[in-house]
Curated annotation (Swiss-Prot):
Subunit record text: Monomer. Forms homomultimers of about 100-150 subunits at optimal growth temperatures. Conformation changes to monomers at high temperatures or high ionic concentrations.
Gene this protein is translated from: ibpA
UniProt-listed Pfam families: HSP20
Naturally occurring in which organism (per UniProt): Pectobacterium atrosepticum (strain SCRI 1043 / ATCC BAA-672)
Domain (sHSP) ranges: 28-137
Official protein name in the record: Small heat shock protein IbpA
Lineage: Bacteria, Pseudomonadati, Pseudomonadota, Gammaproteobacteria, Enterobacterales
Family according to the record: Belongs to the small heat shock protein (HSP20) family.
Amino acid sequence: MRNPDFSPLYRSAIGFDRLFNLLETGQTQSNGGYPPYNVELVDENQYRIAIAVAGFAEQELDITAHDNLLIVKGAHAGEQVARNYLYQGIAERNFERKFQLAEHIQVKGANLENGLLYIDLERIVPEAMKPRRIEIK
């Protein structure tokens, strides 16, 4: 089933609401919500995506930003060891998560800490698009 893209309806929205809506409509639905993630508003122009990547080493993760698309991939290196689980609650499968970013959103960096991959984003509005004060003479 195809999901419609309602992002043109949100053109008048700015900031987190618009980013959140674009992230929701732009993500791939085939991965079943794996891995789970959060989108946090740090301040007016700063955002942070936290993705739960338990079991992945730093070299097994790949982050790519191209145009307004952020792609996060996780692929386990080498062969998987066959284990006899009594209960398996931690998924060990590879993943690809796509995020559609709003205009003027740039990826500033990423770090892996305690099984969470943090990706920092910043909205940088060009000077030409910022409001300017007109002096009355």
